[in-house]
Amino acid sequence: MNETFYKTTALAILAVFYGCYLIKMLLQRSKSIRTDQMGVGKSGTALRVEVVMKIATAVVPIAELLSIFLVTQYPPDPIRIAGIVIGILGDIVFIISVATMRDSWRAGVSETDRTELVIDGIYSISRNPAFLAFDLVYLGILCMYFNWPLLAASVFAAVMFHLQIVLVEEKFLLRAFGEEYAAYKRRVNRYLGRRSAAN
């Protein structure tokens, strides 16, 4: 396969992913919903984690685009093809996640918005499918255009996602939804899979 194919496919994966994010944000804005809650009304650990996560998520797409246009040494074709599959899977998971969450979807945690705990659909097998989708897209592009700066940026962002989940979101959801969320947390894994009733 020639480089034009890989470049076009990588750009399409990113366009679908970030386009979905932008469209959802605009749709929610038309309903007077503020999607981006990262760092808003926060203090302490929550503020630090969300601000750094916001920076990380801004850096990665820049690093991805620079990699697509500037990298000249590429991984073997089988790895790049695997990257395409992983990236497309990430797009699909993200679209389903955002659609299933409906108007309860936020980037970051809102202490003031009234939202519902969504536990059906894709959320019945993953408590954080949107974060999983980010990781899949990052991994997919990395497989197609591997370079060390992109790896560092992607890993840093993935670590910040994890810290956001563990240090901010899970604590917020437990406060907001109590035993309903605690029971859901016992049933469904953080990223993928369900647990047995015994757990």
Which role does the model predict for each range below?
Residues 118-126:
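A short amphipathic helical element positioned immediately N-terminal to and/or at the very start
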Residues 1-112, 116-119, 137-172, 176-199:
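Membrane-anchoring alpha-helices and their flanking helix-loop junctions
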